[in-house]
């Protein structure tokens, strides 16, 4: 089976999963967080090298304050309880996205885990927090302009490969496979630059129901596709 080097996941459907069961949306998020570790373990076991999950978008601030509060509470608990396993399994965790709008406690917890795991090499686990693809591209352009104005780079050096280094995933291979759970078929401002040639897969399962068998199925579907990258 042809296993993708890098998988990106939009974890969609937590709220609908909870509503279907007559439960609060926050319970759906809690169950969704539980699913993350299982999928990371299975991805690593199958030979995937990088996993990037969309945990909180720049647009998610439009949700209720109570829901946002619970989301970051779950994030803090998740990171605190996950540190030992990350070290034991040689997994590096990295957060991508804005950091100026997230509460200080959450950012502090993120930094602790990033620092702790920075030398781990077997697997890279990216969590997109307060992330948006348009923001990512705009921020990269802003930083390039700043470096050019400060005479750190030349105009002639700027091309696609150079620009890519300024993005949140700079230095990492672009995703080979994007999975969006819940059946919704859109990318919702996620990794806009990086998904240019990514294979897309949209299972009907809500994220809390997306288990290891579903991941294996996604990879099996991916392995049957022929990626041409514009060639015949």
Where do the model's predicted regions map?
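Flexible, compositionally biased loop and terminal segments
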Residues: 1-232
């Amino acid at each position: 089976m042809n296993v993708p080097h890098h998988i990106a996941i939009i974890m969609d459907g937590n709220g609908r999963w909870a509503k279907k069961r007559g439960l609060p949306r926050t319970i759906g998020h809690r169950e969704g967080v539980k699913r993350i570790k299982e999928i990371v373990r299975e991805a690593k076991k199958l030979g995937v090298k990088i996993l990037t999950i969309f945990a909180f978008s720049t647009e998610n601030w439009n949700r209720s304050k109570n829901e946002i509060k619970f989301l970051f509470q779950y994030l803090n608990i998740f990171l605190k309880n996950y540190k030992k396993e990350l070290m034991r399994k040689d997994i590096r965790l990295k957060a991508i996205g804005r950091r100026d709008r997230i509460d200080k406690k959450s950012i502090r917890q993120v930094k602790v885990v990033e620092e702790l795991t920075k030398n781990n090499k077997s697997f890279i686990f990216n969590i997109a927090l307060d992330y948006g693809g348009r923001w990512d591209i705009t921020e990269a352009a802003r930083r390039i302009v700043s470096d050019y104005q400060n005479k750190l780079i030349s105009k002639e050096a700027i091309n696609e490969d150079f620009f890519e280094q300024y993005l949140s995933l700079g230095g990492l291979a672009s995703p080979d496979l994007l999975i969006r759970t819940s059946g919704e078929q859109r990318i919702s401002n996620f990794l806009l630059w990086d998904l240019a040639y990514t294979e897309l897969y949209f299972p009907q399962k809500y994220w809390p129901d997306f288990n290891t068998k579903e991941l294996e199925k996604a990879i099996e579907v991916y392995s049957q596709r022929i990626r041409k990258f514009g060639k015949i």
